[in-house]
């Protein structure tokens, strides 16, 4: 479930940057949970030297540990390296080199969707857990230059 159950639908007090964050509840009993945004503009992720996808997330200590992932174009899935990322109670930045998606076959000049999910994508046989996550500041960046 994306958004709060009551108005306002976006989170206004528990944010990393700006004035709102996206709450995302997951319930993975014999399934996985995800939110997808279909892109109609800004689909060329090779322009201006962009090389990284960055997002900030925050969980709740009582969350059931679940794998966190990002998928592009509905197929290429990159998992966070911490299997209990859903239990991190401090805002945590996750930077994904876009080359990881390219290595999985994504045409970065034509990104049609981005998905943020929890659990094992495609799983319909293993019991999972529940929890509440917050997502903020999803952005593309050029590579960082070492000082």
Predicted regions and their residues:
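Short carbohydrate-recognition loop motifs
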Residues: 8-34
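Generic alpha-helical scaffold signal
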Residues: 1, 16, 47-49
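Short, tryptophan-glycine- and acidic/Ser/Thr-enriched carbohydrate-recognition patches
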Residues: 1-7
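Extracellular ligand-binding interfaces
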Residues: 26-105, 110, 121, 125-134, ...
């Amino acid at each position: 479930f994306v958004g709060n159950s009551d108005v306002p639908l976006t989170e206004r007090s528990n944010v990393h940057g700006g004035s709102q964050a996206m709450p995302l509840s997951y319930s993975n009993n014999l399934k996985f949970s995800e939110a997808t945004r279909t892109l109609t503009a800004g689909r060329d992720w090779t322009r201006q030297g962009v090389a990284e996808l960055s997002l900030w997330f925050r969980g709740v200590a009582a969350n059931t540990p679940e794998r966190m992932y990002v998928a592009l174009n509905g197929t290429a899935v990159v998992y966070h390296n911490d299997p209990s990322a859903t239990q991190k109670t401090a805002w945590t930045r996750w930077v994904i080199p876009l080359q990881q998606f390219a290595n999985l076959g994504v045409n970065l000049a034509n990104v049609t969707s981005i998905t943020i999910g929890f659990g094992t994508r495609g799983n319909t046989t293993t019991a999972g857990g529940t929890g509440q996550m917050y997502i903020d500041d999803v952005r593309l960046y050029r590579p960082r230059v070492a000082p």
